[in-house]
């Protein structure tokens, strides 16, 4: 959608815990405003996938500093809704359960956060961007004109994750049940909030939106209204 002329292009930072609706909201808001959407979670998942493919995850758990070698020549880019890692389309692979289990650990490594923060800030220089993640409003773009913090109860987020996995998984593939997903999400919340570098937290200026009982259309509408008031 074409950006309206005569309006200031702003940076919209959307943060929140796993499966709170960040990516879906950010993608739809970007489309409606004619902005660029940048999925930072996909970037961390891409690094995690690369570690898995190279078989270095165990060694990273023992020697986290060795992650620098993994980041040396990494290339992550987006084409529409597709994510490319070193030239390969990994859109589906980065949503696997294995990646989901390890991404919090990879995200806790300072060299990873530093490298991806540089990439994210470079992508946001053009302004007119919607970026979602866990530290966008607090670390990557603390001066973003609009900061949003989405929350939802763990059970509701587990239901969303299950629906996402069901839609994207091949027929016959066994999926984790709701209780397992809820436990995984709760652990991810704890890991994200307690990590040493750039922990998940709400910026004092962020608007908190509880999406537990809210339609995606309504939360998108709320964010767009807040954004248009700042353009």
Curated annotation (Swiss-Prot):
Ranges for region Disordered: 176-205
Record CDD domains: CMPK, NK
Biased composition annotated in UniProt, kind: Basic and acidic residues: 184-205
GO biological process, one term: pyrimidine nucleotide metabolic process
Keywords for this protein: ATP-binding, Cytoplasm, Kinase, Nucleotide-binding, Transferase
GO CC annotations on file: cytosol
EC number: 2.7.4.25
Residues reported in the UniProt entry to bind ATP: 16-24
Sequence similarity: Belongs to the cytidylate kinase family. Type 1 subfamily.
Protein name as it appears in the record: Cytidylate kinase
Organism: Pelodictyon phaeoclathratiforme (strain DSM 5477 / BU-1)
Species lineage: Bacteria, Pseudomonadati, Chlorobiota, Chlorobiia, Chlorobiales
Gene transcribed to yield this protein: cmk
